[in-house]
Amino acid sequence: MKILAPCNHPNEVDLLLEAGADELYCGVLSQAWRSRFTNLASCNRREWRAANLDDVEQLGRVVARTHAHGAVIHLALNAFYTEEQYPLVLEQVEQALALEVDALIVADPGLIRTLHERYPAVRLHISTGGTTFNRATVAFYRSFGAARIVLPRQLRIEEMTAIIAAHPDLEFEAFVLNSGCKNIDGFCTFQHGVSELRHGPLWKVPKRLGLDGLLLDGLRYVPKSLARKVRAGRLPMDSACHLSYQVTDLTQPSTKQSRCLAKNVKDSFSLLAAVDPCAACRLPELLAGGLHGVKIVGRNHPTAKKHRDVVFLRGLLDALSTDMVTDFRAMARQEFRRLYGYACAELCYYSDEAK
């Protein structure tokens, strides 16, 4: 099972691949795009410059370094586009193909069809924004040349396994670290960049300096009174992803599994849900289910955080391959504490069982 790591600068490539990543993915937010459509209408669903390569020159360096390691690199073009945006999107596609990017991560049905018709040999990976919740949707994307599907966060592992079994000749990915939002990517219209617009320096400066991840880490150690203010929305955060939602279990009768799912959804709407969610404990099930790769979220995260994430997963997968681990969950939690310096917060991906 492969490890897919995010990359936002050529200098990260060697470090991440040597740490154990098998594949990288990235996005480009060029000056031409920002000038015409602004950051908020990002071509790859990441509005922050800190999450992106600046231009095609940087992309070329990332591709060259990745290929020098014998690894592969995927370019994200996974937003939904207006007609006037298509020329710049297709220009970036042509530039990426000229640089020999290995695959394009896409979600827009119009773009998927266009790429399949114009570039039938190009590997298309359907983003989680493509909302692939069942085997029929997989068959639909297969008809347009999809080679890989990124499965939504909202699926249970048993559902993933059934979908994979129905299409054994396709590759599938699932998220395992960071950004465990329970909103459905392809349907959600929340704007992640609102706080940056309303409270510019407070949010832009840390991102530009690569310190935003460190600030989020600090939330674990703030007094409970301040943490309550964060949850209540009384600090300058305007992202709808971080409001304090009421989540109700409507299952009748309520079950342990449904209560666990409801709690997991509620816990996911917080600032810490941007950095802490994890599925390390479920790696054995994901591996047994036939998953091609596990994906680390966080193109905007500091390089040190990305590196630590790769080291964490590589160590667990290597241990899993030895068949000598008697209590994998306990080992995963022990490694989490050792590498990250704090205990597992139990913000779990695919938390359909009581812990």
PLM segments and residue spans:
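Conserved nucleotide-cofactor-binding alpha/beta core module
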Residues: N134-A136
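As written
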Residues: G145-A146
